[in-house]
Regions:
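Phosphate-group recognition and catalysis centered on beta-loop-alpha active-site segments
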Residues: 1-339
Length: 339
């Protein structure tokens, strides 16, 4: 590789990926219920580069956008289908999922950000998220798609390719990025869509980077997940590099490592964006898109460490941090969007 091409901006340019990339994690999910129309419309109108989503499949074979394996955290499934409150998404038909309220939980969890109009928001299909991404000619975000628990959904990689192809989303380079924690799914995604950029997500624990402590959170007996992960590190340098090599061998153009958040909390994990790690990625021709940071102090630290893009629940904050042109206020936008 020539000397100039192993820096992040050059790698990103070669893949037609914005640099640094603003990846709206489940939409603008700090200000609106994750993975709903409100969150994705808000992220689009703020100017995010990508709408990030998690893909699963219904009992009747429709691709839907849900993060958790079960529906209890982000819907009223316990009231609607009490005997199936802990059933996986794949046990429900699309009609059943559409009958759930995927917004009211947010109003209860975050009263300071609650809006009456969030009640009764629905779970979305992949088609509906594509419609949102295409809905404003002035704001055209790409899609950053994770295949969730791919073992549970055999053939989801081909199904995704067929859908993206049918919607004309495989024609423009860099418009779609595919992401997975699963090396087998990475290989299958690469087989189906060799030309589409792919990211291997990294964390420390089961089925990923082996921890120096030899412990997984589940076996640690600890209560606080964030502080447990904040202390975890790869078994050694070589273990981390092995995963970079696996990403490269599987067809990835980058990795998606976790990070520690300065305020810890639910989405804080191990620090896998130390400068030497990012440098090792760049030396292998891999971009680094870190998940999931929401505060300026963490944005600054990550950029200083050499990352090429950030997954964030606060796309507006990150866009302002990058001083992108005129980022409107979230509250005003939500109002204009009818929320």
């Amino acid at each position: 590789m020539n000397a100039g091409a192993s820096d992040g901006p050059s790698l990103a340019k070669a893949q037609h990926v914005p640099h640094p990339a603003v990846i709206a994690h489940r939409g603008a999910s700090f200000d609106a219920p994750e993975s709903t129309t409100a969150a994705y419309l808000l992220a689009r109108e703020l100017g995010a580069d990508y709408l990030e989503l998690d893909l699963q499949r219904t009992l009747d074979n429709v691709l839907v956008v849900v993060h958790d394996d079960v529906l209890a955290r982000t819907s009223d499934v316990a009231e609607r289908f009490p005997e199936r409150a802990k059933s996986p998404v794949s046990d429900f038909t699309l009609a059943e999922l559409k009958s759930l309220d995927a917004g009211s939980w947010f109003n209860k969890a975050y009263p300071d950000r609650a809006r009456e109009s969030f009640a009764k928001l629905q779970i979305l299909t992949l088609d509906e998220v594509i419609d949102i991404a295409e809905g404003n000619p002035q704001r055209q975000p790409g899609l950053y798609i994770e295949t969730k628990v791919p073992k549970q959904f055999p053939g989801i990689e081909k199904q995704l390719k067929d859908k993206l192809q049918a919607r004309g989303w495989l024609d423009k380079p860099g418009r779609v990025i595919l992401q997975t924690f699963d090396r087998n799914s990475l290989a299958l995604l690469h087989q189906q869509m060799p030309q589409v950029p792919k990211i291997l997500l990294l964390w420390i624990g089961k089925d990923s980077i082996e921890p120096k402590s030899g412990k997984d959170f589940a076996d640690s007996g600890e209560k606080d997940k964030a502080s447990f992960y904040a202390r975890q590190e790869p078994k050694d340098h070589d273990e981390f590099l092995r995963w970079l090599d696996a990403a490269k061998a599987g067809g990835a153009i980058g990795t998606g490592p976790s990070a520690v958040r300065s305020k810890l909390g639910e989405q804080s994990y191990a620090d896998l964006i130390q400068p030497w790690m990012n440098q090792a990625s760049h030396e292998r021709g891999l971009l680094v898109h870190v998940y999931t940071l929401d505060d300026r102090v963490d944005f600054a630290k990550a950029m200083k460490a050499g990352v090429d893009g950030i997954f964030t629940n606060r796309a507006g904050e990150l866009l302002r941090f990058y001083a992108r042109s005129q980022v409107p206020a979230e509250a005003r936008l939500l109002k204009e969007l009818g929320y």
